[in-house]
Amino acid sequence: MIVLTNRLDKIFQNLKAKNEKALITFSVSGYPDEETGLEICKAISDSGAHIHELNIAHEEAQADGPIIQLANIESIKNGITLDKTINIASKLRAYNPELGICLMGYINNIFIYGIEKFAKKISEAGVDAVICVDLPTDVKEEKELNSALKKYEIALI
């Protein structure tokens, strides 16, 4: 069972009460460049998105289609890092305190960064949830990441 954060719970409860659907959007962090990528996130927020999924750029984004893979590569070429992605999330949180923010990425970026450090930093940035596309459930690594995220009330989806 996925336990959502208070912000995500509130978003879904409000939508359910109004019998409305959620608008959940996606962008690749730092694409086409860091500044423009943040402006895209702000425009998405202004357009009525309830939750925004911010992709952590990865060289081998195998779970994504070819267009998103190319955007990942372009972002990395332009110098996007996990720290910069977290900074973008933080700026987006400051811009819209009500927006649900979810980081989506691959486990080796998180392991290289450090699971505890990652959980703490994204908590400070105001991230609500993490989707780790290549992390199997019920393995040691999933339990370790989930435990660190729960400590900071961040959902692992």
Q: What do these predicted regions represent?
A:
Residues I24, H50-E53, I131, I157:
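Conserved beta-strand positions in the central sheet of alpha/beta enzyme cores
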Residues L23-G37, I101-G114, I157:
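Active-site mouth loops of central-metabolism enzymes
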Residues D46-S47, A125:
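Structural motif
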Residues T25, I44, N55, I122:
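Conserved, mostly hydrophobic/aromatic
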